[in-house]
């Protein structure tokens, strides 16, 4: 495959069961109590809502080092010293959107980052599942902290962890930028913060990376780039485009 080509997955228009019901947040916090995440962090997922998401396309895997390298050469940006088939990480949001514009010009297509709702629909499908592969967490379906790898792996290494639409690596390996700035969901509990001033960047990331615990791999989990060293925390991105 040429670096300009993208393996697109068509996501049909449909209802997203977005987020987590308010009355289930305490149970979620108990389920992941060993990770010691404050319950307030999970409250950002509330309330549950049914959202219509128009049809779109999303890349089957995150952007790889090999795909990034040609853009980097053309724009004077660094290329990570990791294998070409690994996800590129350490990419600021502005650089990710610049890649989208560059590739879009080459393909004659409106390439962009997915919105937060698009990302969650591609991960959850129609049934509002907890993880891309189903309701229960299973070690070995994603490159997360419990696997003990400690770095990225080739994209698509966990086909059994695919989402209902066949999208890969929606959990683990690389955390992924969306185009959506953080804001509480409409109707959110009063204690949900209105901003995330502590975050290095206000845009939502999704999916978790190789260094993260399993709770960040939950389809509903909303978080951000909490450290300036985006390579250390494994932040990458995947592409979206209008429906064919």
Please describe what each predicted stretch is.
Residues 1-75, 93-94, 101, 105, ...:
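Short, compositionally biased
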Residues 11, 17, 22-26, 30-40, ...:
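Functional-site microenvironments in short loops/helix caps that host divalent-cation chemistry
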